[in-house]
């Protein structure tokens, strides 16, 4: 496995792979890797001749500087895991390598067709501009055939599909396939997340109520309206000491707009467990 720190070296290595006709699978990450990431990487390794993983905590997608500073980082540990999984290349640049100071100062602009106006986009202004900025740059460097994203970040996944398939950038990504990968959960049911590292053992036990409530809502949805289930989920989670719902939206999986119909519905939740912000979702 080769660890690459510069765009120039990455482009050189990827060009060699393309010349050799090898299929390239790509998994973009921000590090602090866990079994959820590992499942994406295993799939990428199995389905492609070359597997590339990026490890980069992207500053342009954080609208909270404290959150950026607290985001867990351990490249040595991450690299050991990726080597064991059979990854060929790890791209681990610095922010200065990825962006000029001018790019850091300027607001990246993109037409999201309204996908960024709800949920995470509403709560974290500018977040998805940063996501598209870094993912498009990584795609341009890696030129993958397949790119793997987890469904836990459901809104992000919808926006990446839009970027590749329907946006003004689509022509750049002809032949690129976005692979949706299911949420990986701990034995307790808690959705795996790098942010879980910031939870105490007691907080992890408390946070299990998030997924338990979402799974229970599948039964509630059989006899109740969307609005009734939405309110019941919020009330149930908020009743747990130590948890506070930021939002729970039941949306159409394609448009991300709130829906009153169970067809194509996805429930997306963000909950604070102490100071740690956790997300999860469930398909109805």
Can you say where each PLM-predicted feature lies in the sequence?
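Nucleotidyltransferase catalytic core that binds NTPs
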Residues: 2-242, 251, 255, 275, ...
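Substrate/ligand-engaging "lid" and interaction regions
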Residues: 248
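A short, glycine/Asx- and small/polar-enriched loop/turn
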Residues: 259-265
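Generic C-terminus detector
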Residues: 266-284
């Amino acid at each position: 496995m080769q660890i690459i720190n510069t765009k120039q070296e990455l482009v050189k290595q990827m060009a060699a792979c393309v010349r050799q006709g090898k299929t390239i699978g790509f998994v973009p990450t921000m590090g602090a890797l866990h079994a959820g990431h590992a499942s994406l990487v295993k799939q990428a390794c199995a389905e492609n001749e070359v597997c590339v993983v990026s490890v980069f905590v992207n500053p342009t997608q954080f609208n909270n500087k404290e959150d950026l500073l607290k985001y867990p980082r351990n490249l040595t540990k991450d690299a050991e895991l990726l080597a064991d999984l059979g990854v060929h290349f790890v791209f681990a640049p610095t922010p200065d390598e990825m962006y000029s100071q001018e790019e850091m100062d300027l607001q990246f602009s993109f037409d999201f067709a309204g996908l960024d106006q709800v949920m995470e986009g509403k709560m974290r202004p500018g977040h998805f501009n940063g996501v598209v900025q870094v993912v498009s740059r990584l795609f341009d460097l890696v030129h993958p055939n397949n790119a793997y994203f987890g469904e836990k970040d459901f809104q992000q996944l919808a926006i990446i599909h839009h970027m590749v398939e329907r946006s003004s950038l689509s022509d750049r990504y002809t032949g690129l396939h976005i692979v949706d990968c299911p949420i990986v959960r701990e034995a307790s049911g808690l959705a795996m997340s790098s942010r879980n590292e910031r939870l105490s053992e007691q907080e992890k036990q408390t946070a299990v109520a998030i997924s338990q409530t979402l799974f229970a809502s599948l039964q509630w949805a059989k006899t109740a309206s969307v609005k009734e289930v939405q309110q019941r989920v919020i009330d149930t989670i908020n009743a747990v000491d130590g948890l506070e719902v930021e939002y729970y939206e039941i949306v159409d999986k394609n448009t991300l707009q709130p829906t009153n119909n169970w067809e194509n519905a996805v429930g997306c939740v963000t909950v604070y467990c102490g100071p740690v912000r956790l997300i999860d979702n469930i398909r109805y």
